[in-house]
């Protein structure tokens, strides 16, 4: 359903704010006539997505901040940012590549999370308007957060109809590891309308990667059947989140990597989230082998988003399309190694529709 208030196919740039060292940061508004998307060069963040409910009423369904200052102050939630060089966890922050061991500073207990203490979400990316959207570019130097090789990462956001497409590419001048994803938090009720526990989740995944007590994969690919992690049919998120199941106890809810069915490298369904009340629906497709469903377990109200809303536990959910956590230390997992002359490329699409 087209929303007359939204212009079709427009991209507008404005100044979002200025960093403490004086860098002006742009924000871009993309409109399609159906939804409106805002992205910024700081961390290549997805700032907002306004989408209609079944009656055409618009709401922002992505958690975010009104100003750049909110993102500069938040070093904890990764709210809508592009995380890298290695999204998700690396055990002990250590990995070995071509016989050499590298150390990433730890920032999540004993492990490195989302690229270490200063990940890609904390840099100002170069930006360029392209047909239908924006391309952001970041050059991460050799040794950045302990990772080898100068990595050139590009993230493209393009909007067509009710679908936001995110394309990731990366090249390197030395062998390295890379795992890029977007860490948006979604709430289909609206970003100021309580928690996500009554939304329904469906995951196109028959297996998941169980984790140890520090949320590092054990290396097993376990079936979801018969567990509270079975979302092969739509399930209310909050229905089983408190079950006495060891994997849920470890994470305080859902914070696991599901193995997406189908062939990695091909665009296929990963997840469907629905809100029976508003009628809003989010369909996630990806070329990645996995998707991390995180139910906002560690949000504690210490950050205040748009509308003056404190983001408390389960305020939003993440669907981080990705290679598996700690892949550099698991040779049996799909590889995250990138060599000179190769280009890493992955695509994720987010379709914001309405239930029929």
Task: Name these PLM-found stretches.
Residues 3-356:
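An exposed, glycine/acidic-rich loop-and-rim segment of catalytic or binding clefts
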């Amino acid at each position: 359903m087209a929303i007359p208030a939204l212009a079709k196919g427009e991209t507008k740039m404005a100044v979002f704010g200025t960093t403490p060292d004086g860098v002006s940061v742009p924000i871009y508004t993309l409109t399609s006539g159906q939804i409106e998307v805002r992205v910024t060069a700081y961390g290549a963040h997805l700032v907002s997505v306004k989408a209609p409910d079944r009656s055409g009423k618009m709401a922002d369904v992505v958690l975010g901040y009104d100003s750049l200052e909110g993102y500069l102050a938040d070093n904890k939630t990764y709210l809508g940012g592009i995380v890298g060089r290695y999204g998700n966890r690396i055990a002990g922050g250590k990995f070995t590549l071509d016989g050499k061991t590298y150390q990433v500073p730890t920032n999540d207990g004993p492990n490195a999370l989302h690229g270490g203490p200063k990940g890609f979400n904390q840099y100002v990316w170069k930006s360029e308007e392209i047909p239908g959207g924006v391309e952001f570019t970041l050059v991460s130097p050799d040794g950045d957060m302990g990772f080898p090789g100068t990595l050139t990462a590009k993230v493209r956001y393009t909007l067509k109809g009710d679908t936001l497409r995110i394309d990731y590419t990366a090249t390197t001048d030395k062998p390295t590891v890379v795992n890029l994803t977007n860490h948006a938090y979604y709430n289909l009720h609206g970003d100021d309308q309580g928690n996500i526990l009554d939304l329904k989740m469906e995951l196109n995944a028959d297996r998941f990667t169980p984790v140890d007590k520090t949320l590092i994969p054990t290396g097993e690919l376990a079936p979801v059947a018969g567990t509270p992690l079975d979302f092969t049919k739509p399930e209310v998120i909050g229905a089983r989140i408190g079950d006495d199941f060891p994997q849920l106890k470890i994470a305080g809810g859902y914070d696991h990597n599901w193995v997406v069915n189908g062939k990695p490298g091909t665009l296929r369904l990963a997840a469907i989230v629905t809100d029976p009340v508003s009628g809003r629906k989010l369909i996630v497709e990806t070329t990645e082998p996995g998707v991390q469903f995180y139910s906002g377990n560690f949000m504690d109200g210490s950050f205040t988003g748009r509308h003056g809303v404190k983001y408390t536990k389960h305020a939003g959910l993440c669907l981080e399309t990705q290679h598996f956590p700690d892949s550099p230390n698991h040779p049996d997992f799909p590889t995250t190694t990138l060599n000179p002359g190769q280009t890493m490329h992955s695509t994720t699409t987010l379709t914001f529709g309405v239930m029929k």
